Amino acid sequence: MSRAATTRMGLLEVRARRAVAGKGARLLRAKREVLASELWKLVHDVLEGRARLDEALHRAVKALELAKALEGEERLASLALPAARAVPLAVTVRRVWGVPTPSVAAPPLVRAADQRGSSPVSWGPSGADAARHHEESLEVLLTIASKELHLARLGEEIRETSRRINALEQLVLPALRSEASRIAAALDERDREDAVRLRRFRARHPRPA
């Protein structure tokens, strides 16, 4: 930080900068509190979502194993090929205290048997059940992915905000306080020297009676 002029105007300037930096640190702390509150809510949602995803995947794997046993892997593979599709995703961004956080949305993914690229009669009950469970798992996964992205973005912003707070409180504000003290001390010393010189001048040049 460059030194300010050792003048009363310089002292006022440094004190003004210190006030602005202090206000900035307080605002950043308030921002961090809001972001941390949002983050902890999201952590709870993500943990619940992961538990739901684990359950959905467990059901999907069990259903697939049963379908393989009853219908055979080759038949399931032949049904899976025409059932493949692209899933259109819509990514939107919302802001929390100016922090852009992405959100992922998709249309309903669970399809009826006649929407999977083959005649409904081609699907046995176990194969259709396995397909439905996997589509349900994908829906849960996309919901969690959106929250995970939001969580990661909030974590990054909280870390960046903490770095800025530390820089202000540990570097900028102490430096400004030190600079203000230096200027104030120099001005006081200058005032004392001026007072001494004035007394000497008056002693050498007394007023005529």
Curated annotation (Swiss-Prot):
GO MF annotations, alphabetized: ATP binding; proton-transporting ATP synthase activity, rotational mechanism; proton-transporting ATPase activity, rotational mechanism
GO terms of biological process kind: proton motive force-driven plasma membrane ATP synthesis
Cross-referenced Pfam families: ATP-synt_D
Keywords recorded for this protein, A-Z: ATP synthesis, Hydrogen ion transport, Ion transport, Transport
UniProt family annotation: Belongs to the V-ATPase D subunit family.
NCBIfam families: V_ATPase_subD
Function: Produces ATP from ADP in the presence of a proton gradient across the membrane.
PANTHER family according to UniProt: V-TYPE ATP SYNTHASE SUBUNIT D
HAMAP family found in the cross-reference section: ATP_synth_D_arch (MF_00271)
Protein name, entry field: V-type ATP synthase subunit D
